[in-house]
A protein has these predicted regions:
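Periplasmic alpha-helical coiled-coil/stalk elements that build and connect Gram-negative outer-membrane
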Residues: 137, 146, 153-274, 373-376, ...
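Short segments within alpha-helical structural elements
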Residues: 220-247, 358, 394-450
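Small/polar-residue-enriched beta-strand and adjacent coil segments characteristic
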Residues: 87, 93-97, 103-158, 267-274, ...
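Amphipathic alpha-helical coiled-coil segments and their boundaries
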Residues: 69-72, 79, 86, 130, ...
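Amphipathic alpha-helical coiled-coil scaffold segments and their short linker/junction regions
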Residues: 72-73, 77-79, 143, 206, ...
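Intrinsically disordered, glycine/charged-rich N-terminal periplasmic/extracytoplasmic linker segments
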Residues: 58-109, 154
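Terminal intrinsically disordered/low-complexity segments used for targeting and assembly
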Residues: 1-75, 229-274, 445-463
Length: 463
């Protein structure tokens, strides 16, 4: 009997001391971010007040300087509230793992009876424990471990998605800011042309139609400038939200314009294999399938009838015995007559087949996404290089030749302004091509689940 009473505190010691803090899980996510995004020490292992204060201090230090894409990524990883909420999934999964290793609490019951013959009060006490709960602990822990692994890769995927979103928003905001400057130059050229046309019209040198055409060109330039201002504001706010900023911090500035130095040519031949190996959402789907398999095993073991054993003590009363305490073992057994569990197992089996089909479908989509983004990256790079080699030099040459002819009085001011406007448009299109390249690269990096491998020998354009 003493051994039975000692069983409960011993089990509490063995199963109740595991930590509910997801320190290791957060460390695993931090390693994912460091290896795949290139940012060390941006996932705090603790969530106490001191840790939060350190995070706020780091964000303030980062925002004290103009933003680079690396600095923006650090701020987002530390300060994005949606990511911080997602990180709490690790705490939920860790707590479930600890819970899975615990025995069910013992049950104590009792009754009190009164003798109808005036012999006094009697009753009893019983303490029981489920043996099935102890038998199921290994299966429960396997299921909980799989769910914790699923949570780690799911949160890791969320960090990669956030990194992609920040990079894309960053280059969109950079491009919008540069486009606004180019639109200002275009509007200034249109204003000069309109003023010149107005003076010539007042002097009677051009027709009313020509004067109205120049006025309409100025109207278009002003409308496009207003659209560019709106686009820049929206792009900045998109990035600001991802960085989790508000108040005075929203007045950030860029450290440099959109990067025109493309990285070396990348090796794109084995990206599908890399994606199938490294995609975290694909790993999450695998862990989801594994979790359902463990759940099925757990449910099958749970078909064993519930068995509770314990110890019972009663105070018996009667005419011939007076008051007497009796002590002995107790046992209760569930009778699975109405619900043997077959329907529940069929439901889990259907979930398992569903998860397997979705895993296969995701694998197909992953390969297709990689091929699409790889094609987009190659096309975007070719477009940027064509602008650098051909379009921009030709636009500059045309402007220089037109200026020479203008100085020689072979062409007029209108043609010079028109040439200058065309050059501005070419430059704006080049900025858009650069933006599309960096967006395509960010999308491909997310599609393969990490960084794109670089060739040993490549070209890096610089301006």
């Amino acid at each position: 009997m003493n051994a039975r009473w000692l069983l409960i505190p011993t089990a509490a010691t063995l199963f109740g001391c595991a930590s509910v803090q997801p320190t290791q899980a957060r460390r695993d996510v931090g390693e994912i971010v460091e290896r795949r995004v290139g940012l060390p020490d941006v996932v705090p292992e603790q969530q106490d007040a001191e840790s939060r204060a350190r995070v706020r201090a780091r964000v303030a230090a980062l925002m004290a300087e103009p933003l680079t894409v690396e600095r923006a990524l650090q701020v987002a990883m530390l300060n994005n509230r949606e990511l911080r909420a997602t990180l709490e999934d690790l705490g939920v999964a860790q707590a479930e793992l600890v819970q899975a290793g615990l025995l069910e609490n013992p049950t104590i019951s009792g009754d009190l009876v009164n003798s109808t013959r005036g012999n006094g009060l009697g009753g009893g006490l019983a303490l029981s424990q489920s043996l099935l709960s102890a038998f199921l602990i290994p299966a429960k822990r396997n299921l909980a471990r799989s769910r914790l692994a699923h949570a780690v890769v799911t949160v890791g995927q969320a960090t990669l998605v956030l990194a992609r979103d920040v990079r894309v928003a960053f280059v969109h905001a950079q491009a919008a800011e540069q486009a606004l400057g180019l639109h200002r130059g275009r509007a200034q050229a249109a204003e000069v042309a309109h003023e010149l046309a107005q003076r010539q019209f007042d002097a009677g040198n051009i027709t009313p139609l020509d004067q109205q055409l120049f006025a309409a060109a100025l109207d278009r330039a002003r409308v496009e400038l207003a659209d560019a201002q709106l686009a820049m504001t929206v792009a900045r706010e998109d990035l600001t939200r991802l960085l989790g900023l508000w108040g005075e911090d929203v007045a950030w500035t860029f450290a440099a314009p959109l990067d025109s130095a493309l990285p070396p040519e990348t090796e794109l031949g084995n990206l599908e294999q890399q994606g199938m190996r490294d995609r975290l959402d694909l790993s999450a789907a695998r862990f989801e399938t594994q979790s359902i398999e463990y759940a099925l095993t757990l449910r099958r073991r749970g078909m064993i009838p519930q068995l509770n054993v314990g110890i019972s003590a009663r105070n018996e009363v009667g005419d011939d015995i007076g008051h007497e305490w009796v002590l002995g073992p107790s046992l209760s057994l569930e009778l699975p007559i109405f619900d043997p569990g077959h329907a529940d197992i069929a439901r889990i089996q259907a979930f398992l087949r569903q998860a397997q089909h979705r895993l296969q479908d995701m694998a197909i989509h992953v390969r297709s996404e990689i091929r699409v983004h790889r094609t987009q990256l190659v096309a975007a790079r070719r477009k940027v290089e064509y602008y650098e080699r051909t379009v921009l030099p030709r636009a500059e040459s045309i402007t220089e030749l037109t200026l020479q002819q203008y100085n020689a009085m072979l062409v007029g001011t209108y043609q010079l302004l028109e040439t200058r406007t065309d050059q501005i448009d070419s430059r704006r299109e080049y900025v858009e091509a650069l933006r599309d390249y960096w967006v395509a690269r960010s999308e491909l990096e997310l599609a393969v689940g990490g960084r794109i491998p670089a060739r040993e020998h490549g070209r890096a354009a610089s301006h």
